[in-house]
Every structure is written in C-alpha cells, then in structure tokens.
Amino acid sequence: MTIMRKSHPLMKIVNHAFIDLPTPPNISGWWNFGSLLGLCLILQILTGLFLAMHYTSDTTTAFSSVTHICRDVNYGWLIRYMHANGASLFFICLYIHIGRGIYYGSYLYTETWNIGILLLFLTMATAFVGYVLPWGQMSFWGATVITNLLSAIPYIGQDLVEWIWGGFSVDKATLTRFFAFHFILPFIIMALAMVHLLFLHETGSNNPLGIPSNCGKVPFHPYYTTKDFLGAILLLTLFMTLVLFFPDKLGDPDNYTPANPLNTPPHIKPEWYFLFAYAILRSIPNKLGGVCALVFSILVLALLPYLHTSKQRSLSFRPLSQTLFWTLVSDLIILTWIGGQPVESPYIIIGQVASILYFSIILILMPIAGLIENKMLKW
C-alpha cells in the first residue's frame, strides 16, 4: 500500500496533499476551519443536489415546491433545513478562517490569500442567489433591492439590472437564471478551493508564532487527520443541534409568506451573514457611494499584504495590534446588529461610526500600530 500511494499517479496527489504533507507541529485549533469549510461545501452540494431533484424554478410553483419538499418528500424537511442552516455554518467557518488569517498574518501568502478573497465573493454570490429560490417575501424583495444596487453604476447601470432580471422586474426569468447560477457556482467554488490548496501547499502552512517551522515539521497523517476528524465531529454535533432543535432560528419569518410584488415587507434585510456589509451600504446616503463601500468592505482584504508594516508576522506578541484586531471583531458584530435594525435614529449614527471605524482600523490604525511596535522593540 505504501508503495502504491507513492507511485500511483492519482494516489500520489492525495498522498502529497493529505498524508505525507509536511505540517508545522504547533498549529492550533484555529487551523481546523479550512478542513471544516471543505466539509461544509460537500454537505451543501449533497443536500442541494437532493433539493434540486424536487424543486421547480418557476414563480408559480417555486414556493409550493419547497413546501412539498418539507411535507411530502421522505426526510425532505431535514434536507431543506440542513441546506439552509448549512449556509450559516459555512459563513461562520469562513469568517473565523479569514479572522485567523488576519490574526496570524497568513495574508502574506498573497496568491493563497487572493484566491481566498475570490472564493469569499463567489460564496457570497452563491448564498445570495440561493436565498432567492424559495420565492418567499424576503427572497423576492431581497433580490429586487440588491440587484437594483447595480443601477448606481454610471451609464450601463439600468441596462445591466434589466439584463440580470431578464425583463423589467424580478420575475420568472430571474428565478430560472438564479437557480442555474446557484447550481453551477458551488462546483466552481470547489475547483477554486483546489487551486487555493495548491498554492498553500507550495509555501506550506503558517503557524501561531509566525516563524519558519521547516526544521520541525511533522507528516499530516496521523496527527492532523485525527485533529480534523475531531473538529468535524464537534462541528456536526453543533450543526445537527441547530438543525433539529432550532431550524428557523437564523431564518426570516417573512420568507414563510409567498412572494408578493404588491406588498413590501416593513424591513427588507438579507441573511444575517451579509448584515455587516448591508449596514456599511446603508450608512452612506449616496447610492453609488454605498455600493462602492459595500464592495470595498470585502475588497479591502486584498490590501492587507501591502499594509503589513510590522517586522513580526503574527499578532501573537503584538499587544497594540491585538487590541485593534479584537476592536475590529467587536465592530463587525455591531455592524451585523445594525444591519438588522430599521433606518432610524440612533441606528443610523451608530452604523456610520462603526463603518468609519471598520475602514480606519484596517487602512490606518493597524499599519500605524505595526510601526509603533517596531519602534518599541527598537527594530
């Protein structure tokens, strides 16, 4: 078997990626989230495939087909809630994974980091088009509001929106194409995740100390296969608890009402994992400015490798930067809360302050803190 895994062309790829891969001996539980994201992706593709077998992408039958899945299909309710809550789980793991990358300076592997940002954009696009498919009130109005943002683009905006809609409003054509996008995008994400891994394995993993660990690396199997397996069991336990006991906790009650173009919900808002970006969008009174801020709130991550001023890679021994990092985490939680609140005082001003703080920490305060820490260490 040993000879085969080292000589067979297919087995060799698996061997180099998951068995004999040299891995730092001191990577913590925060490094588990990469493999957990892979698990979430497989889970989403499998549950999605079974849902697609029963779903119909037509405005007249989409809502009732989802109801049919929950009521008449054997274990359909379980598959549907696993898929819906699996998206939330995916984004929890994704945000922790990005947070770990920022904390430990993993963004200095620029190719891996940039592909990761592209993966984040694709995942957000997949989640958005997927949220439209049940054709409930929030699905319809969410699709209308978010796609309408593109009309802020000068000259081509309105044409672009109508092109995406396939008409003059969100209708049958929109739903059909969104279903097609939602089906194909996860496979593109899977292919990109392979490229993400390919570039990661070119450089090797970073570690909590942020220093080279070539002299002490250990094989991935059995150490990290066991660790990842334990992480997967813990994650699935939490996930199934959520699915079986609190299936609607993270959803919107408005989505249990069929889409009605003549009745606008009192508060149109996306799923909870987009609320931070939605709050940034709403905090700018100008439409084009809001759209630019929304895109830049994610795109700003691509600037991190160029804003790294510290002589140390990780934040493990940098108290000033650590304080700023946890302030950023708190700020994102506040933005998420604000995104779900109505547009009225005091939420407007809180959202604006939190948005300014978000960009200030990343673009100004973190680089300055790095320089101050260098001075403190006389570097």
UniProtKB/Swiss-Prot annotation:
The chain crosses the membrane at residues 33-53, 77-98, 113-133, 178-198, 226-246, 288-308, 320-340, 347-367. Heme b b562 binds at H83, H182. It comes from Cratogeomys gymnurus (Llano pocket gopher). It is found in: Mitochondrion inner membrane. The gene is MT-CYB. Coiled coil: none annotated. This is Cytochrome b. InterPro entries: Cyt_b/b6_C, Cyt_b/b6_C_sf, Cyt_b/b6_N, Cytb/b6-like_sf, Cytochrome_b, Cytochrome_b_C_euk/bac, Cytochrome_b_N_euk/bac, Di-haem_cyt_TM. The cytochrome bc1 complex contains 11 subunits: 3 respiratory subunits (MT-CYB, CYC1 and UQCRFS1), 2 core proteins (UQCRC1 and UQCRC2) and 6 low-molecular weight proteins (UQCRH/QCR6, UQCRB/QCR7, UQCRQ/QCR8, UQCR10/QCR9, UQCR11/QCR10 and a cleavage product of UQCRFS1). This cytochrome bc1 complex then forms a dimer. Signal peptide: none annotated. Keywords: Electron transport, Heme, Iron, Membrane, Metal-binding, Mitochondrion, Mitochondrion inner membrane, Respiratory chain, Transmembrane, Transmembrane helix, Transport, Ubiquinone. The keyword Membrane applies. The lineage of its organism: Eukaryota, Metazoa, Chordata, Craniata, Vertebrata.
